[in-house]
């Protein structure tokens, strides 16, 4: 996958939960922008739902599906990979906002990174199995984000 590959067909659903400060997150995530970031990381057509949630929902999903009782930045629920990728990407707004602040990034830049990261997961990339796969995924994220004009997220 190279950054100059044409954008793939993406059926995107973008959802926001109700939580304090949701307007900031809506402003950072206009539909066209989210569509561009995700499409850029796709190797094939996709149907993807992106849901921006509060800490309570993020923690509940992480606990129920990963058995980790805390809110994490992003969860990827991938259902099919071929011929069309179908997935739900759930991002926890308070965690994303805190991490962006701690890492000295804009909210937009951190969301771009996490959406590219989650889209790669939805296509089978993994960084938790072994170091080689982790380095491959990280290098691809850096390349894709650079082509979207974002700095190295690491």
Curated annotation (Swiss-Prot):
Free-text remark on how the cofactor is bound: Binds 1 zinc ion.
Gene: ybeY
Xref: PANTHER family: ENDORIBONUCLEASE YBEY, CHLOROPLASTIC
UniProt: Zn(2+) binding residues: 117, 121, 127
Keyword Metal-binding attached: yes
A molecular function (GO) term: RNA endonuclease activity
Location of the protein in the cell: Cytoplasm
Main location: cytoplasm
GO BP: rRNA processing
NCBIfam families, alphabetized: rRNA maturation RNase YbeY
Family per similarity comment: Belongs to the endoribonuclease YbeY family.
Names of required cofactors: Zn(2+)
InterPro entries assigned to the protein according to its UniProt record, in alphabetical order: MetalPrtase_cat_dom_sf_prd, YbeY, YbeY_CS
GO CC terms: cytoplasm
Known EC number: 3.1.-.-
Function: Single strand-specific metallo-endoribonuclease involved in late-stage 70S ribosome quality control and in maturation of the 3' terminus of the 16S rRNA.
SUPFAM superfamilies according to UniProt: Metalloproteases ('zincins'), catalytic domain (SSF55486)
Protein name, per record: Endoribonuclease YbeY
Keywords tagged on the record: Cytoplasm, Endonuclease, Hydrolase, Metal-binding, Nuclease, Ribosome biogenesis, rRNA processing, Zinc
Pfam families: YbeY (PF02130)
HAMAP family on file: Endoribonucl_YbeY
């Amino acid at each position: 996958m190279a950054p100059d590959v044409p954008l793939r067909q993406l059926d995107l659903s973008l959802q926001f939960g109700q939580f304090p400060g949701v307007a900031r997150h809506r402003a950072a995530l206009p539909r066209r922008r989210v569509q561009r970031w995700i499409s850029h990381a796709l190797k094939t057509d996709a149907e993807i739902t992106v849901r921006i949630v509060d800490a309570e929902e993020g923690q509940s999903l992480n606990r129920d599906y990963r058995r980790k009782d805390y809110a994490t930045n992003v969860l990827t629920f991938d259902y099919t990979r071929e011929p069309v990728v179908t997935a739900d990407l759930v991002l926890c707004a308070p965690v994303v906002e805190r991490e962006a602040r701690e890492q000295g990034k804009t909210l937009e830049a951190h969301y771009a990174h996490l959406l590219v990261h989650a889209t790669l997961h939805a296509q089978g990339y993994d960084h938790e199995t072994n170091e080689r796969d982790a380095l491959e995924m990280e290098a691809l994220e850096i390349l894709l984000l650079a082509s979207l004009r974002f700095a190295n997220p690491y």
